[in-house]
Amino acid sequence: MLGLGLTACGSSPKGTNGDQDELAMLIGTYTNGSSKGIYTFRFNQETGTAVPLSSAALPNPSYLVPSEDGEFVYAVSEMNDSTAALSSLAFDRETGELRLLNTVPTFGADPCYVATNGREVLTANYSGGTMSVFPLQKDGTLAPADTLFQGSATGPDAIRQATPHIHCTVFSPDGKYIFATDFSADRILRFVMHPDNPIPHASLEAVGIEADSGPRHLTFSPNGKFAYLITELSGKVIAFSYDDGCLEQIQTITADTVAARGSADIHLSPDGKYLYASNRLKEDGIAIFAVNPENGTLAKVCLLYTSDAA
């Protein structure tokens, strides 16, 4: 399954209709215009064509993620008030139909990121400066938020970092920790997971980032040995080695060469050989890097523009 949102995508190897060349593609949107919510397509990897299948009405589903088995989809409603929410939907990969199971409040405005480990679902609530944790029920529905983290620190950018912003929450590949990017405080936070309480109230600062960086999204390599962070304001990709909760910086490389202060998403190819970092606001495009399999360092391959205007 390939899941696409305005700022995100996730995948699993299964296609639709038994055809390994085809993937189920889901696109999240903002609905303050003509969009209804989530749209599903059948995407052919060989031809690049997408056939529309279905849609589901949901307010501002700007970020979504499928469950590992592809049976469920978890999508935010990115609202800047108390209506901000997370929804669980059942997904039929054959027909593309989505069926709403339940919706629960995030208790933080503008949820902008979702992650799941099959037991819990996390949201990063950007404007609320909070992280929410939702236990998953056996039927795929979401229980109310179990634990919240409230950010408090701010940063040097008087506009972008004036209030706390949590931008991304991810599970570590060993399943022991949760990492959250503290955008305004220029740091990555680490939380220890426990069977009876997935997040303690106290957090440990895993690593500080250079001031005025704006850490946005974090992703781990398929082998679990490395992690990569994209910084929105400084436009860098920072590579880390990873071992039992510890992130050690090994490289910093530029993704945004025009100082647009709008770098956004970061993903690795399924085989871990390439890394993709998106840039916005000026010369929109995808910076592509080759990954050294031995030490995790990056070498820039090219910048692929998304518009001829660049």
Predicted regions and their residues:
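Conserved small/polar residues in nucleotide/adenosyl-binding loops
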Residues: 305-310
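Short loop/turn segments immediately following beta-strands, especially the blade-tip
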Residues: 42-47, 90-95, 135-142, 192-199, ...
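Asp-box/WD-like beta-propeller blade repeats and closely related beta-sheet repeat scaffolds
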Residues: 97-167
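C-terminal motif of bacterial Sec signal peptides marking the signal peptidase cleavage site
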Residues: 7-8
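Residue-level detector of Asp-centered blade-edge/turn motifs that repeat once per structural unit
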Residues: 68-69, 116-118, 173-174, 222-223, ...
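A short beta-strand motif characteristic of beta-propeller blades
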Residues: 51-56, 100-104, 155-159, 203-208, ...
